[in-house]
Amino acid sequence: MNSNGPLMEHGKRRVAYYYDSNIGNYYYGQGHVMKPHRIRMTHHLVLNYGLYRNLEIFRPFPASFEDMTRFHSDEYMTFLKSANPDNLKSFNKQMLKFNVGEDCPLFDGLYEFCQLSSGGSLAAATKLNKQKVDIAINWMGGLHHAKKSEASGFCYTNDIVLGILELLKYHKRVLYVDIDVHHGDGVEEAFYTTDRVMTVSFHKYGDFFPGTGDLKDIGAGKGKLYSVNVPLRDGITDVSYQSIFKPIMTKVMERFDPCAVVLQCGADSLNGDRLGPFNLTLKGHGECARFFRSYNVPLMMVGGGGYTPRNVARCWTYETSIAVDKEVPNELPYNDYFEYFGPNYRLHIESSNAANENSSDMLAKLQTDVIANLEQLTFVPSVQMRPIPEDALSALNDDSLIADQANPDKRLPPQITDGMIQDDGDFYDGEREGDDRRNESDAKRAAQFESEGGEKRQKTE
């Protein structure tokens, strides 16, 4: 058994954050609800709130063809690499075969977009495997609908599956939790027959994409009971959501005893989303991240859905603050996208007066049924000892080796200094702050981050 009990709430965590400024340049097309620009908006809020001081910020290496074909088929990845808007007429049959078209359009730079999303999750998993950090964040990832040989639901490559496969090299059991409003079908399907990965999805069920995720879908073969689905109805509130989330996840942590956790933080479960009918606020959504942060388990946090960009940026910024355990004010800091957050320019959003179709009795029965299945897990699955496979992203540098071999009379290379975090003592005001000279320096540094798109001080990994 792991010593995975809850820690003191304010325990310090080492947090890595993966971002590439190019991610915001990709465009699904006019009228499409998926806006990669929301990730750039998130990044600017993270920087201007000063959260970068508590993060190790990295620019991930793009995932290679070989990295992505650890899950996806060679034929599918060859298509994504070869097709583009200029030659799409040559790929009509393949577009139909691989479900690339209306919902999943073929846009300029699609393959490179997939490389960034997948590369971030692979790098995050590798960093956790090496025990260099406790939490790794990739808001560029979370594309949970993609299948082995098929695009689906605005997702082309499943960075989550790739990240979990990487985590499994070092961790016997990995827990995947999905709080997107849509069922995490691509991840569930990938691990439906294994007991080394438990997938848990809280989602809207019924006449709603992708139409999967019934309570009765519990896995097959060795994976029976290791797929957990919590189908919900419209209008669920923070209180109702947490009334079922916490008891179920507490039982999952007890019975499955994961060695690592991947949390998909899809923001389309928030009130006001263009596609989602839930009624969560940032506080209710963020409470899920806070729950897992309280455990002594390596945690990967990834993005996902979210189709009201200003609220996506709010949500993932808030959950970054939870990861580093820093309170941030409700007043939004000025940033390049400040006007997007009007008219109130506040971090937190309010719930609406929409009807909550999830009655207490319905949620109680749902909880009872899910926990009854979990109680049938009589033991924690074991794994045979075996050599650890080679890491993905073999280009990762060994930071400690670089530091050890550096000339003491010369400045450390930026690959090292970019990942360094300031000591907590740097953030006191007044006398403890050295007459506030450091605050002034930090303000200049934040401005430099903003003006340069956050690139200059990022560490490539």
Swiss-Prot record:
Deleted gene: phenotype: RNAi-mediated knockdown results in embryonic lethality. RNAi-mediated knockdown results in delayed cell cycle progression. RNAi-mediated knockdown inhibits expression of hsp-6 when adults are exposed to conditions causing mitochondrial stress. Reduces the dve-1 protein level. RNAi-mediated knockdown results in defective piRNA-mediated silencing.
Modifications after synthesis and translation: Sumoylated; sumoylation promotes piRNA-mediated gene silencing but is not required for maintenance of the process once it has been established.
Keyword Transcription annotated: yes
GO molecular function, one term: histone deacetylase activity
Composition-biased stretches (Basic and acidic residues): 429-461
UniProt KW keywords: Chromatin regulator, Chromosome, Cytoplasm, Developmental protein, Hydrolase, Nucleus, Repressor, Transcription, Transcription regulation, Ubl conjugation
Cellular component, GO annotation: chromatin; cytoplasm; germ cell nucleus; histone deacetylase complex; nucleus; NuRD complex
E.C. no: 3.5.1.98
Tissues expressed in: Ubiquitously expressed throughout embryonic and postembryonic development.
Region entry Disordered, spans: 404-461
Region (Histone deacetylase): 13-325
Reaction(s) the record says it catalyses: N(6)-acetyl-L-lysyl-[histone] + H2O = L-lysyl-[histone] + acetate
UniProt-listed InterPro entries: HDAC_PDAC, His_deacetylse, His_deacetylse_1, His_deacetylse_dom, His_deacetylse_dom_sf, Ureohydrolase_dom_sf
Cellular localization per UniProt: Nucleus; Cytoplasm; Chromosome
Impact after mutating residue 145 to F: Loss of function
Task performed by this protein: Responsible for the deacetylation of lysine residues on the N-terminal part of the core histones (H2A, H2B, H3 and H4). Histone deacetylation gives a tag for epigenetic repression. Plays an important role in transcriptional regulation, cell cycle progression and developmental events. Histone deacetylases act via the formation of large multiprotein complexes. Involved in the endoderm determination possibly by repressing end-1 expression. Also involved in vulval development, possibly by repressing lag-2 expression.
Family: Belongs to the histone deacetylase family. HD type 1 subfamily.
Assembly notes: Component of the SIN3S complex, which contains at least sin-3, hda-1, athp-1 and mrg-1. Probable component of a NuRD-like complex, composed of at least lin-53 and hda-1. Interacts with lin-53. Interacts with pop-1. Interacts with akir-1. Interacts with wdr-5.1. Interacts with cfp-1. Interacts with dve-1. Interacts with tra-4. May interact with nasp-1. Interacts with chromobox protein homolog hpl-1.
Protein name (Swiss-Prot/TrEMBL): Histone deacetylase 1
